[in-house]
From Swiss-Prot:
Compositionally biased tracts (Basic residues): 473-483
Segments forming domain JmjC: 199-355
Gene name of the record: kdm7a
Keywords, alphabetical: Chromatin regulator, Dioxygenase, Iron, Metal-binding, Neurogenesis, Nucleus, Oxidoreductase, Transcription, Transcription regulation, Zinc, Zinc-finger
Lineage: Eukaryota, Metazoa, Chordata, Craniata, Vertebrata
Protein name from the UniProt record: Lysine-specific demethylase 7A
Highest taxon, organism lineage: Eukaryota
GO biological process, one term: midbrain development
Organism: Xenopus tropicalis
CDD domains: PHD_KDM7 (cd15640)
Residues that coordinate or bind Fe cation: 251, 253, 323
Presence of the UniProt keyword Isomerase in the record: no
Zn finger (PHD-type) start-end: 6-57
Acidic residues bias locations: 648-666
Amino acid sequence: MAGAAPVYCVCRQPYDVSRFMIECDICKDWFHSSCVKVEEHQAADIDLYHCPNCEVLHGPSQLKKRRNWHRHDYTEPDDGTKPVQAGTRTFIQQLQARSFPSADDLLLKMNGSQLTQRYLEKQGFNLPIMVPRLDDLGLRLPPPTFSVMDVERYVGGEKIIDVIDVARQADSKMKLKNFVKYFMNPDRPKVLNVISLEFSDTKMADLVKVPDISKKLSWVENYWPDDSFFTKPFVQKYCLMGVQDSYTDFHIDFGGTSVWYHVLWGEKVFYLIKPSDENLALYESWSSSVTQSEEFFGDKVDKCYKCVVKQGHTLFVPTGWIHAVLTSQDCMAFGGNFLHNLNIGMQLRCYEMEKRLKTPDLFKFPFFEAICWFVAKNLLETLKELKEDGFHPPNYLKHGVKALISALKSWMKKESVAEHAFEIPDNIRPGHLIKELSKVIRSVEEEGNRPVKSQGIHGHCPVSRSSHEKSSHHSGRKARRLRDHSTKTPTNLDILEHHTREVLKRLEMSPWEEDAGTYKLNMRFNKPLLPSSTEPDQKVRDNGIRLLLSNGRIIRDERQPFTDRSLYTADSEDEDDRARSRKAKDIKQEKPCSTSGMEDKAETQKPLNMFFESVKSELRNGSSEYSDISDSEGSEDNCTNQKHFSEESESSGDDDDEEEEEEEERQEPIRNLKEEHSGRRLPCDPNFPWPDHDSPQKRECPTSTSMEQEAVQGMLSMASLHYPSALPTPAKSTDCNIRGGYPQLHIRVSQGNGKEHLDSHSHKAANSDHHVKDEGEFSALDWIRQPDASCRLSPQDSCQVPQSLRREFAHEEYEKAPEDKHYLEIEHWDSAEYQPEKYDPESSMSSGECHLSDGSLSPTRIYGDTAAAVPLHPTKRPASNPPPISNQATKGKRPKKGMATAKQRLGKILKLNRNGHARFFV
């Protein structure tokens, strides 16, 4: 049939490149060696081959005649003109007769327990190591009675193995069963040696466990990914079977690998040469010479050491050592090769030498360049981790990474990238990896003087470790990076980014509505300070947080276990620890925008039931925002000019047990009203921030009568808020904070000599990057019962508020609010000057001043909603002041259903407490 492939041999099969064939000198047909029972190594000895068909007519094949014992081609005439070649019988005899310096002075002899990763990292792996016993080495082997026939049983007789014809120093292939037959025959026509039987994929692999040290250091064990496109290199388990006089000439193990040998039975002799620069240069020159086999390389160097490895001994040969091996008696040995981090530079140097010498792929480390890319990727991570942990990498690793970078760069050059592109893993970006690795090693070299962290101190090595350790180590590192990032405390930048998004979301909300039902009320009421003549300033700062509420839910009560931690932000626990220790440094000042066209004071009167309505609306619909940064980016009408001085201040401390008991007693009269709102109380945080959509005006605080205090008590009871205890002495002072998502008003009133003094101090604003300070002078018996106009301003009107208002009065009067109306009226105001200025801790505590400042970050605070203004209890503003904005929506409204009951309770409380202690509350 036309186009059909030609067929050969007695089997009439087409040509197969993987099968050895021999040509018949008579019929010129080709035959498979396995079909005609001719081994590959035997074909070299045949002078004329006759196939089975031709053999009948022309007789058997004719063998070559031996004419010498010192040349690879034994048919050459022995005229004494040609030198002895390596591996021949003459060469072996001469080698055994020579004397060499003993390696005893060179070798490091130690026990298995001493050969540790930490030792090699500290001392280096530069000299051969001899371990005379298996104890503590981690090496498991078959018993010394294990024979070549056992190897055949475990591996399989049909396995094709590489065999070296020692006399010719040529390799060939044969079946394992044929080699075993040869080995067991005492009459051996030639010397054959097996040195490359890798059995990791056979049953015999279970009988052998490699030394712990080689497994811990091995690149393949540590860095080769299981899902790699490339076939994983198996070079750790070799069985070496050699008959007497087997010889392997001088060589460096492929890829510059280190190697371990253990002689199970028999004996081997190693001829060792140091890998100095001079010796390596000589070796490369010798290897490329056409007369290589005629020159004994040991004669070219200064010293060649002889090391005898006896039965039961284990020898470790470091990277780059040039060595030859003679089998002085029949021997079976096990060994393995491994790349590692201790000598990266030398490994790369040996690999480049192999390429220059054009070493066949069969004798090179499988996928050497691919594993270098994997190692580079992992070492980049390792260096970053060492730097993150505050350790300087050891010198051997630093030098190795630099050598690796140089090699990777050379492989990526335009003129050679095509040659190396095949071994670049798909999941690696070579250019980016080289750049990042160069950057990290450069930064490591610049840092310099840090303690060196051994990679084997704690039983595992982040740079080189066993497969079990690798998986656990990488999983731990991965959890730490994603670290570990699920449990890691957020950084300031993380918090900033998160809350910037929150601010932007709030800025997209619709403008403020003038309906009181849309306002949010968030308030904090401090307990009265204990009288102290020596620590007034400290007491003011140490007012504790009593309650935190978000979305109408109590999330912290110091008298009850805190259970709902889910409402914390990611960094709130960290802030708990940090906020208590912070001290006030500066505050941010804010200039209020001017306003005009304020209406008459009569138009600002707001029925008390509207205040209750707004409170209920807050409890029903309000939500507290979790924010750590300022959301003071106002609308385009906001004319506030801000300056940042500091973001830190001391947060409030905890109150003592006595104050807690007093608080319990104070809460009894209003506990039933709190139950009306399902036990929900507004947050009592001394440091809760107010938003800065509009600059709030100063609140002026005239004194209160007993009736007004009782009315406020009932009013606050309606809002499910705590009521502070009475002031038992005229000198006692108390603090009260009003917060509703606005800069906090922290007021301290001291009663004495018929006068009241207001004081405030500034706290850190955790969700605001600025502080506001207002100062004003108050005359005696001034008290506020009218809402701040600026808190009722629309964004359009907020810019018209005057920057400075100051009014002084000689007398102030009070009007009692009718009980059926449930609101309070005040005819006169004491207007203090509102002037931003630098914060002064001392002046802030002096009497006659009222400061507006942002709330500080308290350890358990939850941040309040900053999207709407705060509705305040009804008051009056004097006609001399610019009239406040009129809110028509609040005039003439009837109380909502259910408010009558609340008013009845309020009236009852007012009657019960009519003759009680003088109390006040804001």
